[in-house]
């Protein structure tokens, strides 16, 4: 049974500026493993932008806002074939367990100007029904992340 679907799109240039700038944006958003996996790629910014989009899509699929679960609690890893997979930690992993999530499908795509991701969560319905999303759950902007006010 599908428990949640999330979709996100990112303008790569807008994300690329803070990735290469001062302020620790990359370290606040990505895990060390994600940064290492993309470090030597020719399409580094696009690859990180796709991972950023997947993190956002995962939060949407879980019905969580950015303030409820940090982006570093969603890690995008590759399986043996190189396909993207989600690894959840902290409160987001607990939330997924409570909701009965058993499998996550992740699809990433990018072009020079945009990156996008879709996350589909499957599992069995549990008694812990997913609460309605808070009205302000998505009330933030990329600038909020850049300024570290989340």
Regions flagged by a language model, labelled:
Residues 1-150:
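Core catalytic alpha/beta fold that binds nucleotide/phospho-ligands
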